[in-house]
From Swiss-Prot:
Descriptive protein name: Elongation factor Tu
Alphabetized PROSITE patterns for the sequence: G_TR_1, G_TR_2
Subunit annotation: Monomer.
Keyword Protein transport: no
Source species: Oleidesulfovibrio alaskensis (strain ATCC BAA-1058 / DSM 17464 / G20)
Superkingdom: Bacteria
Chain spans, region G1: 19-26
NCBIfam families: EF-Tu (TIGR00485), PRK00049.1 (NF000766), PRK12735.1 (NF009372), PRK12736.1 (NF009373), small_GTP (TIGR00231)
Reaction catalysis annotation: GTP + H2O = GDP + phosphate + H(+)
Region (G4): 136-139
């Protein structure tokens, strides 16, 4: 049979493999593409193709990531796999590869290891909504009780980071054995099919961007004589319709106004939606009331904050970052959406300093409030040069 064309009718879900080094993430990724190709006729991707993942730049940070895709009867998946531990951390913090769910791979021969823990913690901090477990290398463990023990340990670990450990699907199998299958009906292929079923049923379908509350970061402000003030930007999520009330949030006190017009490419529209670059005409707003760095948002959907906790990756010297460590009290710029805002960094107790190439937890206090929520990404800059990337993990005030 020929290659099926890519059907857009199925819901699209972004997923990725996480877990400790050498526990079998890349082998599992290859096995999934192989079994899915045998069952659905999609393309199989070999281990070495995934392993030599090309390096990409995301906000100036070099990340090696492999992207594969496959289908189940219900969904289309885009799957990311990273060769190195540092790549995972950078990936999750920058949001370079958005994950709607993750498959955590744990070798039954080892049980949970330090990176297993770190990846689960990061998944929690950056807001990965759900995790499915693949217990790998089960063919190398003869003792059923040992498997039970490892499974229990993984469930407890998930629960300790506020994932529902007791309800999480745990699939046992061998990625390597599955990779050797010639048919999707082979016994060794069954765990992979079970895993895909678990992803289908357990990882929720992501909410479409257009269904979320409206938000547009303001890039520019113009005043048009006789018509009023227009702000331009790219709609990040939701839909804005002419006549709707909206808030202007961040930097200054929140203002409420009404959208009296939406235009795109100089044409008037009745609405703008996620992905559109638009100009929004605001009623009764003066040119000086609004500035770049604020956002337009659906009323009560987002609030301005100054103080937050964040997971941050600090660029290494090779990536063009700092050459020296920094300490509590460091004052760089935080680039949120469209603008830089100065903030002061506090390090966690017991952490003396942060070296280039490290990832760390920061407590940040900005000099102006910014419209923010958990999961918001930002860059840390010094004089226009990016020295770090982060994600808001908790709002403090």
């Amino acid at each position: 049979m020929g290659k099926e064309k890519f059907e857009r009718t199925k819901p699209h879900v972004n997923i990725g493999t996480i877990g400790h080094i050498d526990h079998g993430k890349t082998t599992l990724t290859a096995a999934i593409t192989k079994i899915a190709s045998l069952k659905m006729g999609s393309k199989a991707v070999a281990y070495d193709e995934i392993d030599k993942a090309p390096e990409e730049k995301e906000r100036g940070i070099t990340i090696a990531t492999a992207h594969v895709e496959y289908e189940t009867t219900l969904r289309h998946y885009a799957h990311v796999d990273c060769p190195g531990h540092a790549d995972y951390i950078k990936n999750m913090i920058t949001g370079a590869a958005q994950m709607d769910g993750a498959i955590i791979v744990v070798a039954a021969t080892d049980g949970p290891m330090p990176q297993t823990r770190e990846h689960i913690l990061l998944a929690r901090q950056v807001g990965v909504p759900s995790i499915v477990v693949f217990l790998n290398k089960c063919d190398m463990v003869d003792d059923e009780e040992l498997l039970e023990l490892v499974e229990l340990e993984v469930r407890e670990l998930l629960s300790s980071y506020d994932f529902p450990g007791d309800d999480t699907p745990v699939i046992r199998g061998s990625a390597l054995k599955a990779l050797e299958c010639d048919s999707a009906d082979d016994d060794a292929a069954k765990p992979i099919l079970e895993l895909l079923d678990a992803c289908d049923s357990y990882i929720p379908e992501p909410e479409r961007d257009t269904d979320k509350p409206f938000l547009m970061p303001i890039e520019d402000v113009f005043s048009i004589s006789g018509r009023g003030t227009v702000v331009t930007g790219r709609v990040e999520r939701g839909i804005i319709k002419v006549g709707e009330q909206i808030e202007i949030v961040g930097i200054k006190d929140t203002m409420t106004t009404t959208c009296t017009g939406v235009e795109m490419f100089r044409k008037l529209l009745d609405q703008g939606q996620a992905g559109d670059n638009v100009g929004v005409l605001l009623r009764g707003v003066k040119r000086d009331d609004v500035e770049r760095g604020q956002v337009l948002a659906a009323p009560k959907s987002i609030t301005p904050h100054k103080k937050f906790k964040a997971e941050v990756y600090v660029l290494s010297k090779e990536e063009g970052g700092r050459h020296t460590p920094f300490f509590s009290g460091y004052r760089p710029q935080f680039y949120f959406r469209t603008t830089d805002i100065t903030g002061i960094i506090g390090l966690e107790e017991g952490v003396e300093m942060v070296m280039p190439g490290d990832n760390a937890t920061f407590i940040v206090e900005l000099i102006h409030p910014v419209a923010m929520e958990q999961g918001l990404r930002f860059a840390i800059r010094e004089g226009g040069r990016t020295v770090g990337a982060g994600v808001v993990s908790e709002i403090l005030e």
